[in-house]
């Protein structure tokens, strides 16, 4: 189990699991100090290499409920060890909001809003071609951080005007994803970018499910409930 949450440890300690399985926990808590200080020197490729050496021939599977790091690193480690798992390239395409929209626009163009990538390493120098208002968010983020409804170019520039410290934190947060993206895909737009999207109205839901051996299995349709007056998820 990579990058376990408290729920994972409690649930997997239940007798129904302990009776038949042995779990090994690896990773750190991205949202708790001092664990998250490890981001300053974290190298995802070396991390996968180390775990592959440590667990080769000792385990039957790699799992993670951690969206930010865990799912992708679990896929990379499973592939390295020859264990069942998702293709890392598929995880990357699903988690990178710009490339996910590119796939959606080819498969279901009528259900995909207009969108545009906005790299921020060199600052934002021109408004998005899709115009305003638009919804802007990082191509790789968590907990709706930096997601905003933007009405003007001035608001967009203010949103993307990061201090040196903020820029450092953002780079460290997405560097593991960028490193693995370059390793497993030909994608050229890294995670240090935002995506601007056409405004959508309506009920917001999650379609939960999975694909196994080419067969799509839908688990359910889940309501997304936001904190009042915000774009932050409160519960599902």
Regions found by a protein language model. Give the residues of each.
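Conserved anion/nucleotide-ligand pocket segment
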Residues: 133-155
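ATP-dependent carboxylate/phosphate-activation module, predominantly the ATP-grasp catalytic core
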Residues: 154, 191, 198-236
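Short acidic-hydrophobic, aromatic-tinged amphipathic segments that line or gate anion-handling sites
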Residues: 114-120, 148-151
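Conserved ATP-binding module of the ATP-grasp superfamily
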Residues: 111-113, 153-201, 232
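Glycine-/Pro-rich loop/turn segments that contact NAD(P) or position catalytic residues
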Residues: 79, 91-110, 123
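Solvent-exposed alpha-helices and their adjacent loops that cap or buttress functional pockets
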Residues: 127-129, 139-142, 186-189, 199-202, ...
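Domain-scale recognition of functional cores that engage charged ligands
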Residues: 71, 144-146, 177-178, 190
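ATP-binding N-terminal substructure of ATP-dependent carboxylate-amine bond-forming enzymes
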Residues: 1-90, 119-124
């Amino acid at each position: 189990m990579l990058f376990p949450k408290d729920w994972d440890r409690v649930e997997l300690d239940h007798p129904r699991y302990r009776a038949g399985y042995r779990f090994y926990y690896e990773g750190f808590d991205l949202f708790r100090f001092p664990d998250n200080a490890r981001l300053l020197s974290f190298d995802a490729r070396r991390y996968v290499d180390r775990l592959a050496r440590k667990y080769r021939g000792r385990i039957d599977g790699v799992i993670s409920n951690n969206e930010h790091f865990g799912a992708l690193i679990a896929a990379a480690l499973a592939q390295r060890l020859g264990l069942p798992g998702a293709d890392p390239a598929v995880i990357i395409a699903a988690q990178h909001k710009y490339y996910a929209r590119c796939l959606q626009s080819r498969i279901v163009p009528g259900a995909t809003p207009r969108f545009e990538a906005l790299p921020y390493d060199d600052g934002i120098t021109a408004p998005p071609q899709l115009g305003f208002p638009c919804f802007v968010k990082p191509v790789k983020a968590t907990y709706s951080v930096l997601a905003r409804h933007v009405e003007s170019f001035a608001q967009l520039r203010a949103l993307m005007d990061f201090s040196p410290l903020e820029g450092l934190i953002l780079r460290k947060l997405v560097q593991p994803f960028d490193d693995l993206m370059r390793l497993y895909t030909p994608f050229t737009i890294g995670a240090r970018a935002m995506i601007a999207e056409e405004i959508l109205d309506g009920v917001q839901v999650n379609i939960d499910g999975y694909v196994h051996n080419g067969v799509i299995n839908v688990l359910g349709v889940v309501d997304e409930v936001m904190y009042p007056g915000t774009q932050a998820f409160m519960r599902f």
